[in-house]
Structure formats: C-alpha cells, structure tokens
Amino acid sequence: MTLKLGAYTACLHDRPLGEALDVLKGNGLTSVEVNTGGFIPSPHCHVDLLLSSEQARADYLGEFSSRGMELTGLNCNGNPLNPLPGVGPKHADDMRRSIELAGALGINNIVCMSGTPGSDPDAKYPSWVVNPWDGVYMDVLDYQWDVAAKFWSEIDGLARANNTRMAIEMHPHNLVFSPVTLKKLVDLVGPRMSAPRWTRRT
C-alpha cells in the first residue's frame, strides 16, 4: 500500500474549492478530505446539490481528477449523540447524508467522531466520563453505551448499504477516545469502522 499525502480542506475554508485544491497541489499533496457537516460548515461540498444530481457529482469529482488529485474522504465530525435538540439530531442527519453521498461518489471513508450522550435520558448536555471510580459513573457509562450502540448499529447498516467505512477519530470529549473504547464500539456494533488517526488535530 502506498502512503498518500493529503489535507483536510477546512484549513482553506476561506478559499473556493478550485483555489484550495491548487494550493494543496502546489504543496505536493494529492489526497483530499472535505467537510460535509457536523461542527463546521461545508464550503467545499454542497451536499444537497450533489445528492440530487449525477451530473453535479461528475463535475465535482472532475475538480479533483483534472488536477491529478483524489477525494479520499468525507468529514462530518460532530456529536450525533448530543442531547441538545439543535445539535445532536442535525449532526446525526449530516452523518447519514454524508454516508449516502459517499456511496454516490464512490468514496470509501467517512471521517467522524463517535459523539457523547448525556448522562441520563433527561440530561440537557453531553457528559464525558473518563475515569469511572464510583458506581454512579458506571451507571452513566452503561446508559451512554446503550445509546451509542443503537445509533451506531443504524449507522453501520447504512454504511454497509453504501459500501463505505466509518473512520472514527479517537478524540477527547467523545465516548470513543482511545483504542480500548474504539474496540468496545466495534465489538458492540460491527467491523465497518476504523481509526484513521491516533492523535488529535492541532
């Protein structure tokens, strides 16, 4: 397997896609990851348009191929398990649409985060438990893993249907933030997940 050097175009969010790709190519990069929702806007990927038009998808992929570059991943980092009504459902929908778009574009990797639920069904905010030394925190984790297993089982099925892979970043403030927690999610849900990065971005 050949190592591909690339970049996440969020670092050039203030440039149009073509200009951003020219900057990356000028720095010797050939692999590209673009944002499709979650925490930040997606200026380099108009998801609704691409989902609705085969011609738009062909033109979009042509932006990369005409420069000798490859779109290797869609990024929808967010918290799909967030109990806040204006956050979790939107991020979850962004993830579903990203998977559907990846299938339509022939992209294999969806870069994402596991998300973090609240501590209980009535929680208003996410709760990140790192070191559960007390029984109440074990109860919190049991609830959170139940929530995660249901959501990620759905996502696993959607990923399989679209022949894509969920590449989960093990990131702080997420239920999956270490190799141990990643393995737990895979054991609960299924094998169409991987860990593309072992460190957080800076």
Where are these regions (language model features)?
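Boundary/entry segment of secreted carbohydrate-active catalytic domains
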Residues: 1-15
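Active-site acidic/histidine proton-transfer and metal-coordination neighborhood
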Residues: 19, 59, 63-66, 73, ...
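Glycine-/proline-rich flexible loop or hinge segments
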Residues: 41-47, 75-83
